[in-house]
Amino acid sequence: MSNSAAGRLNQTSHILNESIKNDDISLRRSQPSTTSLQALEHPFKVTVIGSGNWGTTIAKVVAENTALNPHLFVSRVDMWVFEEKIDGKNLTEIINEQHENVKYLPDIKLPENLVANPNLIDSVKGADILIFNIPHQFLPRIVSNLKNHVGPHVRAISCLKGFEVGKKGVQLLSSYVTDELGIQCGALSGANLAPEVAKEHWSETTVAYHIPKDFRGEGKDVDHKLLKALFHRPYFHVNVIEDVAGISIAGALKNVVALGCGFVEGLGWGNNAAAAIQRVGLGEIIKFGQMFFPESRVQTYYQESAGVADLITTCSGGRNVRVAKHMAKTGKSALDAEKELLNGQSAQGIITCKEVHEWLETCEMTHEFPLFEAVYQIVYNNVPMKNLPDMIEELECIAD
């Protein structure tokens, strides 16, 4: 190992140790059970914006909890659906009649209090909590349509994975929602493959929410206790923290790493290569967070479901791995592979690697993130996948 590489390793270890030592982690398992929450004078109305497989799955989780906790929530949960025809019939009609999203989450029975709504503005009418769960490239348009239809009392949770890159630089999607709509927005992310959660196989997730300065008081506003009551299920265990930046960064960048894992898997290089990609990827995720979002906590990447656990799960399967593997085996482009495999849904790593590249190029720092840059070059500039190890090694040497 070179002296510079050893120095970087020691520096990373020092950052991790200091972060864990100095952070107050007493909050980690402090949330009480939902039975300790007092009945609210005005129960919260919840709307889910998005109806893909993850959007529908989260809507199912939330609707189960609103029905079970009428002292906290209005039972009815609206789910905004981008209307489309299935065998000549509106998807919203099918969902509301059959209580099943036959296109994006087939064979999963949905709660009867979950109502599909094709009208975005109507779906958020009277809502106190918005849950955004759409492909992140559509967020600006959705937010633009919601302006003047969402009051300042509303709170939000983003389940989106990605960044907004613009005049303000690289921005968390939760921050984008806050800036554009004037409402406090947290995030949900974790080792959660939608089909497994929908089938009620046990898993964990992380919800991050920072209590705003205009907090109206317990029982009158959204806090950590209420969020746990909204999302926690016997099969879906929730930990609520404040590190919105940390879980958002991990949730976005893991998809880029997963593309790299899909490439080496498709090339038949085996588990050693996949482990190497994940090792480099985790380091770059942490480095990106510390460099551009210093408020993020290093311990989040190691201790939370939204961190290394999500990275492992995503790199073991999921959309991004499938698309990248298909690219490696067929020679097709990322967009063609996505179209063939995903039934109208998105592999978010394809867009995220471009956003990250554009930001790093602006900062003249692409060499600091060799895996992210290599994935971008393979996806957008048709660089041969077999060059991946050399690209990582070459850029690591430049960074030294």
Curated annotation (Swiss-Prot):
<dbReference type="Pfam" id="PF07479">
    <property type="entry name" value="NAD_Gly3P_dh_C"/>
</dbReference>
<feature type="binding site">
    <location>
        <position position="319"/>
    </location>
    <ligand>
        <name>NAD(+)</name>
    </ligand>
</feature>
<dbReference type="InterPro" id="IPR013328">
    <property type="entry name" value="6PGD_dom2"/>
</dbReference>
<dbReference type="GO" id="GO:0046168">
    <property type="term" value="P:glycerol-3-phosphate catabolic process"/>
</dbReference>
<feature type="binding site">
    <location>
        <position position="161"/>
    </location>
    <ligand>
        <name>NAD(+)</name>
    </ligand>
</feature>
<dbReference type="InterPro" id="IPR006168">
    <property type="entry name" value="G3P_DH_NAD-dep"/>
</dbReference>
<dbReference type="GO" id="GO:0005829">
    <property type="term" value="C:cytosol"/>
</dbReference>
<dbReference type="InterPro" id="IPR008927">
    <property type="entry name" value="6-PGluconate_DH-like_C_sf"/>
</dbReference>
<dbReference type="InterPro" id="IPR006109">
    <property type="entry name" value="G3P_DH_NAD-dep_C"/>
</dbReference>
<dbReference type="GO" id="GO:0005634">
    <property type="term" value="C:nucleus"/>
</dbReference>
<feature type="binding site">
    <location>
        <begin position="319"/>
        <end position="320"/>
    </location>
    <ligand>
        <name>substrate</name>
    </ligand>
</feature>
<dbReference type="GO" id="GO:0141152">
    <property type="term" value="F:glycerol-3-phosphate dehydrogenase (NAD+) activity"/>
</dbReference>
<feature type="binding site">
    <location>
        <position position="161"/>
    </location>
    <ligand>
        <name>substrate</name>
    </ligand>
</feature>
<dbReference type="InterPro" id="IPR011128">
    <property type="entry name" value="G3P_DH_NAD-dep_N"/>
</dbReference>
<keyword id="KW-0520">NAD</keyword>
<feature type="binding site">
    <location>
        <begin position="50"/>
        <end position="55"/>
    </location>
    <ligand>
        <name>NAD(+)</name>
    </ligand>
</feature>
<dbReference type="GO" id="GO:0051287">
    <property type="term" value="F:NAD binding"/>
</dbReference>
<feature type="binding site">
    <location>
        <position position="348"/>
    </location>
    <ligand>
        <name>NAD(+)</name>
    </ligand>
</feature>
<dbReference type="InterPro" id="IPR036291">
    <property type="entry name" value="NAD(P)-bd_dom_sf"/>
</dbReference>
<dbReference type="GO" id="GO:0042803">
    <property type="term" value="F:protein homodimerization activity"/>
</dbReference>
<feature type="binding site">
    <location>
        <position position="138"/>
    </location>
    <ligand>
        <name>NAD(+)</name>
    </ligand>
</feature>
<keyword id="KW-0560">Oxidoreductase</keyword>
<dbReference type="GO" id="GO:0005975">
    <property type="term" value="P:carbohydrate metabolic process"/>
</dbReference>
<dbReference type="Pfam" id="PF01210">
    <property type="entry name" value="NAD_Gly3P_dh_N"/>
</dbReference>
<feature type="active site" description="Proton acceptor">
    <location>
        <position position="254"/>
    </location>
</feature>
<feature type="binding site">
    <location>
        <position position="194"/>
    </location>
    <ligand>
        <name>NAD(+)</name>
    </ligand>
</feature>
<comment type="similarity">
    <text>Belongs to the NAD-dependent glycerol-3-phosphate dehydrogenase family.</text>
</comment>
<dbReference type="InterPro" id="IPR017751">
    <property type="entry name" value="G3P_DH_NAD-dep_euk"/>
</dbReference>
<protein>
    <recommendedName>
        <fullName>Glycerol-3-phosphate dehydrogenase [NAD(+)] 1</fullName>
        <ecNumber>1.1.1.8</ecNumber>
    </recommendedName>
</protein>
